[in-house]
Regions:
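N-terminal Rossmann-like dinucleotide-binding module
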Residues: 1-53
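Conserved G/P- and acidic residue-centered "switch" motifs that form tight phosphate/ATP-binding loops
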Residues: 11, 102, 147
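Alpha-helical structural signal in soluble globular domains
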Residues: 22-27, 47-51, 90, 94, ...
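Short loop/turn motifs at secondary-structure junctions
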Residues: 30-32, 52-54, 71, 148-151
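Short, well-ordered coil/turn segments that N-cap beta-strands
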Residues: 31, 73, 96, 123-124
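Beta-loop-alpha module in the N-terminal Rossmann-like domain of NAD(P)-dependent dehydrogenases
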Residues: 53-117
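A contiguous active-site-proximal alpha/beta segment in oxidoreductase catalytic domains
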Residues: 105-152
Length: 152
């Protein structure tokens, strides 16, 4: 890889800043964050201070970010669940590949619309299930597998 893949992050909460953005610190040769959006000014300031994202590339809403020309190769959508589909569809319209936090949507029609748009745009959409690899879920799995609450 000659240069890192660029990312814009919609939603700078625990997932956006601590799960996804932190990867840049571990692998700067693979990932560069170029823009972000969050209603909390302290989170935007953290993105600027910790990841070198210019103030002009930090926005108060995902909609403001998505109104810009495309600022990265990939859009990470880690906003509130109810915002996922609209932001994902808008990001695909801009030509972004997507890393999409779960849930995509509780509605099958919206999931199918997103799948269709991604196919038409020839874009990759990855839906994340990152917690399944945490120690908490591993312990829970072992307890259930061992019959701690009976047969499931």
């Amino acid at each position: 890889m000659d240069k890192p893949v660029t990312f814009a992050i919609c939603g700078l909460g625990i997932r956006g800043l601590e799960a996804y953005a932190a990867f840049q610190k571990q692998h700067p040769e693979k990932m560069k964050i170029t823009a972000g959006a969050d209603p909390d000014p302290d989170r935007r300031a953290a993105l600027q201070a910790n990841y070198g994202v210019p103030a002009g590339s930090c926005f108060a809403t995902g909609e403001e970010l998505l109104a810009q020309p495309r600022l990265a190769d990939v859009m990470i959508i880690a906003t509130q669940d109810r915002q996922h589909v609209a932001q994902a569809l808008a990001a695909l319209d801009k030509g972004y590949h997507l890393v999409l936090e779960k849930p995509i949507s509780p509605l099958l029609d919206e999931c199918l619309a997103l799948q269709k748009k991604a196919h038409e745009a020839n874009r990759v959409v990855v839906v994340c299930h990152v917690l399944r690899y945490t120690k908490f879920y591993g312990t829970l799995y072992e307890l259930l597998r061992g019959g701690a609450i009976g047969r499931i």
